[in-house]
Amino acid sequence: LPNNRRLSAQIWRAAVGRVPLLLLDSDVTGNDDAARGITDRLYGGGGDHRLQQELLLGMGGVKALRVYERLTGSPAPEVFHTNEGHAGFLGVERIRELMDNGMGWEEALTATRANTVFTTHTPVPAGIDRFDQSQIRHFFSAGLAQSVPTDKVLALGAESYDGGDPGKFNMAVMGLRLAQRANGVAKLHGKVSREMFSGLWPGFDVSEVPITSVTNGVHVPSWIDPEVTQLAREKFGVATVHDRDWNRAYEISDRDLWDLR
């Protein structure tokens, strides 16, 4: 980090069914007080605090995967999914790995894009993380990814399109530039995203902007309380939550709904 500071993180492994979930924790001995607080909240931090969270998540996340591969013998990921711009720096870390092994910038960028996908969740520009270009330069000039030219990193997130702010570094823009494929999280959201990011594809009609959509979904039995399912069975005689006519929900009295609490 700048000013000869270091940021270390402990890796916690949680088992989600058969899927290992790796979590990064900066509250460890050896970090200064500011660094220990980087992972103290999910949202709400601003300025350098938020930037350091996203550097840790993206670049530190790739490093954590490499440690996990080495310790467990797990295969290396074949595809990296950047779920919103928060983890966008994972692409920079992967480019650094390739450049450290002799690739040039363009070759490393192409290789990284080839197996990276990006999902945007945000339907309004105000919801996207943006930093001053000077902040990004300050951190990367300190040697975060020594083999990667800082100007190349800055160009990835530059709002270099009509209506953009040349002084800002946009995490979603970087995510899109580092990905082979991109999607929104609903059909309408895909349309909104194509409009919102159309400046990245000058000369394309909005309908041709290469952002598709994958509709969010949930595993219904996991997310619906058994008491709600039982109420549906009692009121409508349905065998499972999949036998549904949502319009009949209006037949349930307010009292029955309050009693579920």
Residues covered by each model-derived region:
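Catalytic cores of carbohydrate-active enzymes across secretory and cytosolic contexts
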Residues: 1-261
